[in-house]
Amino acid sequence: MTALYNLFFKLYRLFLFLCLNIFFLLSGLIIKTLFFLREEKTAGTTALLAMLWAQACCRILGIRVTLSGNYQGFKLGFIVCNHISYLDILVMGGIRLSIFVSKIEVKKWPLLGWLAVLANTIFIDRKTKKGA
């Protein structure tokens, strides 16, 4: 019975995760459309939506985030890191308003690529000298 419950719980979390991604994808599309696709008007709202999305994903996936040290809140800054897994993106994105830099290939990924585009991700083509 426990194995069946664990399987059901994992499938339930996966379903919630997919629903959450679709909800934020549609929300981003609506916001971009309402403001006529003008990035200067939607950048703050988009960053806030991306942060809320990351926090909700962490909660659904059972990820607990603990901050230690001298955390200064939402100040401007530039964070450079080499993440170990895709969960790192959720954790970092849920802590502060962020705009991510990503490889250009991510843009073509279904669902997550679309979310990255809506979140104003900066895409870098690492195959060209100009892009890298």
Locate each region found by the language model.
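Soluble catalytic domains of membrane acyltransferases
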Residues: 59-132
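A transmembrane-helix-recognition feature enriched in membrane-embedded lipid enzymes
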Residues: 2-66, 114-115
